[in-house]
């Protein structure tokens, strides 16, 4: 406790038991996207902007072979044909799947909204990024991050069904974060007047209840019997004693036992999903920024 307060002297000592130190990384998300686009171009990819997908195209056998698109600057519509069509549109994944008239689409996405607030570092001077429980009995963890003379803190985690292009920071988001940060740093006394900027983003989470920390039905725990059944069926599959369908049946049964209740947003898995439809449309969704290269390699 004493060492934690030496590192973070403004931290509230009440109920503080201790802390830990871990390594983390930071990145510029917009720059990361641009660098990936540049590298794809270097490797022969054709980059287009302001072009919107409208329909999924199929060949005479019903297999996906391209996309009909519209240039939003000129209004021109045209077809783009390809051997593979991969849907990597994040929160919009279900919308793209619905463009495929050969699919019966069951929604798989559960987008949640995350909000950060920004104050001047003179108002909240944290020496290094700090990660702590929100203190609001919701299972959330919150960051306070110093960067370039400012301090960011967040994030929230709430279900979102609004405009995906323009998620808004609501008063409830601000109130939640101000209460959380002032509970942990009471001497700072941060108010709405200290907030210089804010932003909201969407997490493209998978709706299925597959996370290890799921808090819904069956107390969110996989029973020992179910765990043994999964291990046994996978072992038999590796020995070629059962089919892939047998493995899927066991996993589907396990999922159904965990889906009695809808988990809260923070309990939804941050894992990824790779789906190949019968007509060949590939959808890669979910995941985290730290996994994006692994996800891409797995899809290819």
Language-model segments: what does each one mean?
Residues 1-35, 42-44, 48, 60-62, ...:
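Flavin (FAD/FMN) cofactor-binding and adjacent substrate-gating region
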Residues 21-22, 67-71:
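Short beta-strand segments that buttress and anchor functional surface loops
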Residues 39, 101-153, 158-300:
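C-terminal catalytic lobe of FAD-dependent flavoproteins
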Residues 46, 55, 81, 141-143, ...:
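Short, surface-exposed charged micro-motifs
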Residues 50-54, 71-73:
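Conserved SAM/SAH-binding loop
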Residues 63-67, 127-128:
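Short, hydrophobic/aromatic-rich segments at coil-to-beta transitions
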Residues 73-84, 88:
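Core beta-strand elements of the Rossmann-like FAD/NAD(P) dinucleotide-binding domain
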Residues 87-103, 297:
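Flavin (primarily FAD) binding-site architecture
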């Amino acid at each position: 406790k004493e060492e934690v307060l030496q590192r973070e002297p403004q931290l509230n000592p009440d109920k503080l038991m201790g802390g830990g130190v871990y390594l983390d990384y930071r990145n510029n998300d917009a720059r990361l996207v641009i660098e990936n686009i540049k590298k794809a171009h270097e490797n022969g990819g054709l980059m287009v902007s302001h072009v919107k997908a409208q329909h999924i195209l199929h060949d005479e056998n019903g297999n996906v072979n391209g996309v009909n698109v519209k240039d939003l600057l000129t209004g021109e519509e045209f077809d783009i044909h390809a051997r593979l069509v991969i849907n990597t549109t994040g929160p919009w994944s279900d919308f793209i799947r619905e463009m495929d008239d050969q699919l019966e689409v069951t929604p798989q996405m559960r987008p949640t909204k995350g909000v950060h607030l920004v104050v001047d570092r003179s108002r909240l001077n944290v020496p290094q990024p700090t990660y702590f429980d929100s203190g609001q009995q919701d299972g959330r963890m919150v960051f306070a991050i110093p960067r370039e003379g400012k301090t960011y803190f967040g994030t929230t985690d709430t279900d979102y069904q609004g405009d995906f292009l323009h998620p808004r920071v609501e008063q409830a988001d601000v109130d939640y974060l101000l209460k959380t940060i002032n509970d942990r740093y009471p001497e700072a006394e941060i108010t709405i007047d200290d907030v210089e900027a804010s932003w909201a983003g969407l997490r493209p989470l998978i709706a299925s209840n597959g996370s290890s920390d799921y808090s819904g039905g069956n107390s969110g725990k996989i029973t020992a019997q179910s765990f043994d059944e999964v291990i046994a069926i996978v072992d038999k599959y590796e020995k070629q004693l059962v089919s892939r369908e047998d493995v899927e049946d066991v996993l589907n049964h396990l999922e159904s036992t965990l889906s009695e209740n809808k988990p809260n947003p923070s309990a939804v898995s941050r894992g990824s999903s790779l789906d190949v439809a019968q007509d060949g449309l590939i959808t890669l969704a979910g995941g985290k920024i730290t996994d994006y290269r692994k996800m891409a390699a797995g899809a290819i």
